[in-house]
Amino acid sequence: MAGVPDNVKGVVELDPWLAPYGDILSARRFLADKWRHDIEHAVPGGRRSLVEFARDAYKSYGLHADAQSKSITYREWAPNATRAFLVGDFNGWDETSHELQNKDEFGVFTGVFGPGADGDFMIPHDSRVKVVFELADGSRIHRLPAWIKRATQPSKETAKEWGPSYEARFWNPASPYKFKHERPRLDPNVESLRIYEAHVGISTPEPRVGSYSEFTKDVLPRIRDLGYNAIQLMAIMEHAYYASFGYQVTNFFAVSSRYGTPEELKELIDTAHGMGIQVLLDVVHSHASKNVSDGLNMFDGTDYQYFHSISSGRGEHPLWDSRLFNYGSFEVQRFLLANLAFYIDVYQFDGFRFDGVTSMLYHHHGVGERGAFSGDYNEYLSDHSGVDHEALAYLMLANDLIHDMLPANGVTVAEDVSGYPTLCLPRSVGGCGFDYRLAMALPDMWIKLLKESKDEDWSMGHIVYTLVNRRYKEKVVAYAESHDQALVGDKTLAFWMMDAAMYTDMTVLKELTPVVDRGIALHKLIRLITHSLGGESYLNFEGNEFGHPEWLDFPNANNGDSYQYARRQFNLVDDGLLRYKHLYAFDKAMQEAEGKHKWLNTPQAYVSLKHETDKVISFERNGLVFIFNFHPTQSFTDYRIGVDEAGAYRIILNSDREEFGGHRRIEEENSVFHTTDLEWNGRRNFIQVYLPSRTALVLARNP
């Protein structure tokens, strides 16, 4: 460890190959530590914590009502403006009557407005507001307050007169929702996350936008029944364009009004907590919508207030048609860190899945030739790696904040395809602080196999290598498919395997066809081996647990604004005559087995067998034996499987059970597999099992 800076010795001890890059790692950590020091000492003559900094920001910026005095304070940062005025329904949209009188040296305007003539708040609850800025040349621009907590689509009449831009509303309910349940306390040393990825708007079988209340009533019970202990909510931050899937955020502190009110979202999260389910927010800090009239773009009349300037070449994403934040700006740090604290405190979110981390980490955004990462450390840690040091420092601060606010159970997940080293190691040892990264190579592997290879040509070694290929001590969220694979232009695993047969042959009243038989069998095997071998956490996109047919396509001009494919057909599971119920039952059994035997939050599995001819894979993890026969036709009698611990083993999960859509080829009752004291495949003992084609077994040793 000679020559390695003290502040990154921890990560180098975990990965000695990082030693030559110690100085670079140290400098990157130093920038984040310096920013934190500057933030905590920004108050003259005093000190405040990072948490206090973030909380003070969301509690002071924007519109805030004082219940005792009935006054409203409005604070906004707009350094390019010379004057600022609050307008809205409350003053007949008079652009001169309510000026924010004070502008400080940093460009922050503040106005305090007393009660109205009736003694109540000057601005009625849920009424429309805007801010008007006067610029140096005397021109005026109209904007939605940057910290607004509710924004809604205009009525048809308003849209005809003023355009389709969203409208800001002053949210100040007389009886705000009161949380009833504490956050679930999942011991991270024991429990692992089984995440159900969901989008409230599509969570209805009907071709329309679903609501928070419907999700609470109809979907949460399904998630609990399946055995997932966390939900990842997508498209919550307000976005004017529904078809953006929530990734073109316009109003960062407003939750999507399409689904209902802020209080109804609070009830959803509180209800989930009462079920013992954590709730994660899919947070979008990687970019922002280009919208001007209802977004952050050109907010104070400049293109460089929250974002890098267009002229710098860093202000726009090359593919996403969106604006890119200037993470080196103190005020941008305030805005984004406060955004995280706001969702933790006000809505009781338990953590975040950070969207677009690869785009944030590199000046090239993972696009083009430089986005084809080979794993060479020079791609990440050389002077020419293209890493955006300011974005990396912001992500470190964000992780500091979240884990300071939620020290026991806060969860952070990075959507990173690049494999950046130390991303998911603790800040205390020199890492970036994320708890998990998404294992984004796994769904790509499964789709590629299904598209390009015959079943008999699948390489067991390639499957295993891809599933276990992750950085030491850096945890990943494994998944076979997510929302990305469901989007139009791609297909879900079930649709790749069964295609048109899902429309005609899923009824139990018809004889099982070879296409559906294969699809159901492989769907179970793919998901179980991904779950058990691919990571330390698991994610499923809603509907995929039962093999949801078709693709996901939001209403847009190309499909005639249709909602036909922007929904989840949960009714298919409830129909006892359809085979979707079998896949649902298997997914439930898989989650229950993990919940009881807890293989996810344990060291990586020991893989003892990858047989290319037999198409059999076997491994042990946390005392369990997992056996997969991917062969399309060949079943094996008395197949030898190496196990380390001697004893008697029993089946705890069998994909061939009838209730899972299998053929019941294994007699489970009173089945016990006794070990033979002879070495096999590098293990001290072996058992012999009957292994039908396209079947998976999980065995546990009897106590």
Swiss-Prot record:
GO BP field: glycogen biosynthetic process
Catalytic activity: Transfers a segment of a (1->4)-alpha-D-glucan chain to a primary hydroxy group in a similar glucan chain
Record pathway: Glycan biosynthesis; glycogen biosynthesis
Top-rank lineage group of the source organism: Eukaryota
Active-site residues, Swiss-Prot/TrEMBL: D355, E415
Site description Transition state stabilizer, residues in chain: D484
Family annotation (Pfam families): Alpha-amylase (PF00128), Alpha-amylase_C (PF02806), CBM_48 (PF02922)
GO CC list: cytoplasm
Subcellular location per the Swiss-Prot or TrEMBL entry: Cytoplasm
Main location: cytoplasm
Protein residues bound to (1,4-alpha-D-glucosyl)n: W93, K130
Family: Belongs to the glycosyl hydrolase 13 family. GlgB subfamily.
The protein's name in its UniProt record: 1,4-alpha-glucan-branching enzyme
Organism: Eremothecium gossypii (strain ATCC 10895 / CBS 109.51 / FGSC 9923 / NRRL Y-1056) (Yeast)
Origin organism lineage: Eukaryota, Fungi, Dikarya, Ascomycota, Saccharomycotina
